[in-house]
Amino acid sequence: MLSAEHRAIVKATVPLLESGGEALTTHFYKTMLAEYPSVRPLFNQAHQQSGDQPRALANAVLMYARHIDQLEQLGGLVSQIVNKHVALNILPEHYPIVGACLLRAIREVLGAEIATDAVIEAWGAAYQQLADLLIGLEENVYVEKETATGGWRGTRAFVVARKVKESDEITSFYLRPADGGELLEFHPGQYIGLKLIVDGEEIRRNYSLSAAANGREYRISVKREPNGKASNYLHDSVNEGATLDLLTPSGDFTLEHNDKPLVLISGGVGITPTLAMLNAALQTSRPIHFIHATRHGGVHAFRDHIDELAARHPQLKRFYVYEKPRHDDEAHHAEGYIDEARLIEWLPATRDVDVYFLGPKSFMQAVKRHLKTIGVPEKQSRYEFFGPASALD
């Protein structure tokens, strides 16, 4: 039980987390992944090496400590965590491992003089409160997905019905249930989890669903990353007829249905969730402005599909920005990068729009800044990270 004294102690550690939280979480991951191999498949080693995962956890721990008296203020963060956990099939038995390693990291990084028995006790109680909250919320989602039409719990086998090269870097996989059963619906913008065995090692990854729900199959579109263990395995070793283990669709970066003009802005492989949103939005009459930035035509996936949609749907306007176009690239609307002048030109005159954007972090930082400058309300601009969440400001 988290007492008033526990809360006071946790809040008193906020300055320490602000200055040293990342060192603490880096030590935490190093310890946990070395000593508990059972949890390694749940974490992307590239995100560990880049520091993105420890940084994201440090921010989450800090936010929790700051709002320990008003957990309702964590609503958005809690929802993101629950969705990520469900897509990876995080289970109650994983939480004691995390808790033990977190408390150990607090003691070892802060030292016994600061991380006294009282501090460890307070953080132990605080962690248990958070774990109980997440376990309960996640169980609700697991039950909801298991009992829904076409739903399941844990993994379900899917067959690769088609494998299609979309660009020099991106390949799509069309996945149908191996049991021939019904398919769980999903919301445009959500992702799905894959459980893979690569070189004898289990790994789990999340990939955006890149086509609107059709009741027959899911589509993921995977960019080959130079050192990506999962993406290279999918590109090189998974062919039509292969079977993959999928976890249920998840994610809270989803299309909100209303009559406002819709603006979809993507960079690189960030196009994948916006495609599902685009296809769903075209079932309505709302105006759509689709803006995509990429390096050049060779890595521009789905161009023919979007051009064909624009030819059939007058409500859709699309704009392409090539950073370094090749001499034989098809026509594009601008060279370089998306900037304020181009957004002013390409967006509707009204700033009462709904904007969804996704891409590399530096791309999203620039887009967020430009949208704010030209007057798009911040509450109507939504974004998501591939991988651990971070701050754009």
UniProtKB/Swiss-Prot annotation:
It holds the Pfam family Globin. The record marks 84, 384 as: Influences the redox potential of the prosthetic heme and FAD groups. The record marks 29 as: Involved in heme-bound ligand stabilization and O-O bond activation. Heme b binds at residue 85. NADP(+) binds at residues 268-273. GO terms for molecular function: FAD binding; heme binding; metal ion binding; nitric oxide dioxygenase NAD(P)H activity; oxygen binding; oxygen carrier activity. FAD binds at residues 191, 205-208, 385-388. The active site is at residues 95, 138. It catalyses: 2 nitric oxide + NADPH + 2 O2 = 2 nitrate + NADP(+) + H(+); 2 nitric oxide + NADH + 2 O2 = 2 nitrate + NAD(+) + H(+). Its cofactor is heme b; FAD. Disulfide bonds: none annotated. Binds 1 heme b (iron(II)-protoporphyrin IX) group per subunit. Its EC number is 1.14.12.17. Residues 1-139 form the Globin domain. Residues 150-393 are annotated as: Reductase. InterPro entries: Cbr1-like_FAD-bd_dom (IPR008333), FAD-bd_FR_type (IPR017927), FNR_nucleotide-bd (IPR039261), Globin (IPR000971), Globin-like_sf (IPR009050), Globin/Proto (IPR012292), Hmp (IPR023950), OxRdtase_FAD/NAD-bd (IPR001433). GO terms for biological process: cellular response to nitrosative stress; nitric oxide catabolic process; response to toxic substance. It is an enzyme of class 1 (oxidoreductase). CDD domains: flavohem_like_fad_nad_binding, HmpPa-globin-like. Residues 153-256 form the FAD-binding FR-type domain. Keywords: Detoxification, FAD, Flavoprotein, Heme, Iron, Metal-binding, NAD, NADP, Oxidoreductase, Oxygen transport, Transport. The keyword GTP-binding does not apply. Is involved in NO detoxification in an aerobic process, termed nitric oxide dioxygenase (NOD) reaction that utilizes O(2) and NAD(P)H to convert NO to nitrate, which protects the bacterium from various noxious nitrogen compounds. Therefore, plays a central role in the inducible response to nitrosative stress. Belongs to the globin family. Two-domain flavohemoproteins subfamily. In the C-terminal section; belongs to the flavoprotein pyridine nucleotide cytochrome reductase family. Consists of two distinct domains; an N-terminal heme-containing oxygen-binding domain and a C-terminal reductase domain with binding sites for FAD and NAD(P)H. This is Flavohemoprotein. It comes from Burkholderia sp. (strain TH2).
